[in-house]
């Protein structure tokens, strides 16, 4: 049976020594008599939708099982980074910090060196059997959860499948109306977008600004074996910077052709989410790289009030040649399969207990609590062992959306310290059948060209960040100019590449290649 559901020894108190065989200690529950509290500092992933995480029934059930109180401390929504830095500077720490330390001012190793966090390597190897089982079952998880030193510094949360939440999509009802097939090749896309334009859809293909203000037509990046950041050279397997490669120039040339033909929204660089959604809702635009919830669900629900036939369909990632397997190369220089990391601080009086509490959520039982909630109330188990949410969640009597209703019981859309279960995520995130179908279509691609998201060595981090901030800003400016024709892909390309090189690309490339080698050696 799962370690998470063993109750053979009902006496309170956790084992405190490694077993004689050197195997990790299997905890017996409860771990305490309800007289111990573990404080956890973390962002409110629900952005205020949950007023108090201690009221979520999954955590209440876990506390009862473990005999330990879990108390959440959350910085105010909108000022998380500032409050996190103040908490670190204060010297007064909780027992556990759950955070993405890869994006904080100091990373895990630096916080251990500074005396804020414990090096958890021995704690994890001794008291986290469920977590170790997750690492052993997946090579990508193991590498991401391992520091360059070979140590386990924290417990990572993981995503069970490639974290794909957006991809190519087009109006299925219009394909049918105009007698068009689903586009597969770039030539197919050119034809489909042209027919849409001829039928009164002003700018068939659109995009908009990402949260960081950047703008990319992700639709074709993978088609041309490139990325808007670091990627692997398809010929040599070496790390290269996508935006200065010939493949990237070919990608830009295709976008420039579409722009000149009037197939691309001329305001693409200025669209915020509202503007982009408005164009896709009223039919001025009919295709793009769309997100499952923010675009496909929201736009479809709004448009169907006046057009019941309105439907988006997820398309395969475009290819150059008929019959070629679609490729998916994640943008922004690689992809983590892991989210936040849970680390025990030096202020924790019982690090063993804290580790065992965190480890419980990696057991099948603990993970089910976080993803599904309470059996019979928020979910049921089918005869074949699969689970599904109850009507109380999917058709809530109080009018709550499924995403709102589940928060009384569980957090399937927000990782705590769990492996995100694909089934629960899909049932919750994809309430329209076309959303689930789109995600499956986007995942049906060759993912082997992806490089992992890498962490540059601490001593090079400042230099790397300064170089890449300058380069990224310049590349974004030129990207828009090349697409719109303000810059010429023949006359101006060499000067563009030389400018990027002159900003220190060689040094950044060296740091990135070094990080890749260390990752591969883990």
PLM segments and residue spans:
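Helix-loop-helix "hinge/cap" segment bordering the ligand-binding cleft or interdomain interface
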Residues: 121, 147-215, 230-284, 342-353, ...
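Conserved N-terminal structural module of periplasmic/extracytoplasmic solute-binding proteins
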Residues: 1-188, 216, 225-231, 236-243, ...
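Conserved small-residue motifs centered on glycine
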Residues: 43, 360-480, 486
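Extracytoplasmic/periplasmic substrate-binding proteins
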Residues: 36, 44-57, 162-169, 176-182, ...
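Short acidic loop-to-helix transition motifs that present clustered carboxylates
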Residues: 77-81, 188, 271-274, 320-322
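Paired acidic/hydrophobic, glycine-rich loop segments that form the ligand-binding mouth/hinge
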Residues: 94-98, 204, 286-291
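Glycine-rich, aromatic-lined ligand/substrate-binding cores of catalytic
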Residues: 257-259, 276-299, 307-310, 316-326, ...
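Long, His/Glu/Asp-enriched segments that create or flank divalent metal/ion-associated functional microenvironments
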Residues: 61, 291-293, 300-301, 429
